């Protein structure tokens, strides 16, 4: 069976939103998904953009990007997706890619689709001269950890992720 990675289109948004919910269910955090299809569409295709796009990206670059893989047996159905955005290293003075979501539907796992999506983003990094490609993974997701190790990715064990949200964010801001 042949799988092809391609940039997402507006027609993919509904299925991508469904896969975001599927991913959240897998990660035991479905109650945290409040984003709508419309918000996803706007971030990907609706004109939400960085006001000052980096020189090595198209002018008016979108705030969010996505690549998908079609189900070769079911036209119009998606097998997997990668949602990503640009980040920047102040130490290296270069842009990179931050992978927000990587998801392959259960019936397609173990066939190399996750690696194919990761490889496509790595190709974008190298073609554009970006110097890093990074993401987070839950410590219990052994299947994903195995994939990441197999491609040569290394964990950044010395870092701790912090987050401010909701009332704590508002309280601190005020």
Feature map (PLM): residue ranges:
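Conserved N-terminal entry element of GNAT/NAT acetyltransferase domains
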Residues: 1-14, 25, 169-174
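Hydrophobic adenine-recognition pocket in adenosine-nucleotide-binding enzymes
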Residues: 8, 102-104, 137
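Conserved GNAT-fold acetyl-CoA-binding loop/helix
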Residues: 17-53
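Conserved beta-strand in the GNAT
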Residues: 68, 76-86, 103
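A conserved beta-turn-beta hairpin within the catalytic core of GNAT-like acetyltransferases
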Residues: 77, 88-99, 109, 156
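Conserved acetyl-CoA-binding loop-helix of GNAT-fold acetyltransferases
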Residues: 104, 110-123, 146, 150
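Conserved active-site alpha-helix within GNAT-family acetyltransferase domains
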Residues: 115, 127, 139-158, 164, ...
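Conserved GNAT acetyl-CoA-binding A-motif
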Residues: 126-136
């Amino acid at each position: 069976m042949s799988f092809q990675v391609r940039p997402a289109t507006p027609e993919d948004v509904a299925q991508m939103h469904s896969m975001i919910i599927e991913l959240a269910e897998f990660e035991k955090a479905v109650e945290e998904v409040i984003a709508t299809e419309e918000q996803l569409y706007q971030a990907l295709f609706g004109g939400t953009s960085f006001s000052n796009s980096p020189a090595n990206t198209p002018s008016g670059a979108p705030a969010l990007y996505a690549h998908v893989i079609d189900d070769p047996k079911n036209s119009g159905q998606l097998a997997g997706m990668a949602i990503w955005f640009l980040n920047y290293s102040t130490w290296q003075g270069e842009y990179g890619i931050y992978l927000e979501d990587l998801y392959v539907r259960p019936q397609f796992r173990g066939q190399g689709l996750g690696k194919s999506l990761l490889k496509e983003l790595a190709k974008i990094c190298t073609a554009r001269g970006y110097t890093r490609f990074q993401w987070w993974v839950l410590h219990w997701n052994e299947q994903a950890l195995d994939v990441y190790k197999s491609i040569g990715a290394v964990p950044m064990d010395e870092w701790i992720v912090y987050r401010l949200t909701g009332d704590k964010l508002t309280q601190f801001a005020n």
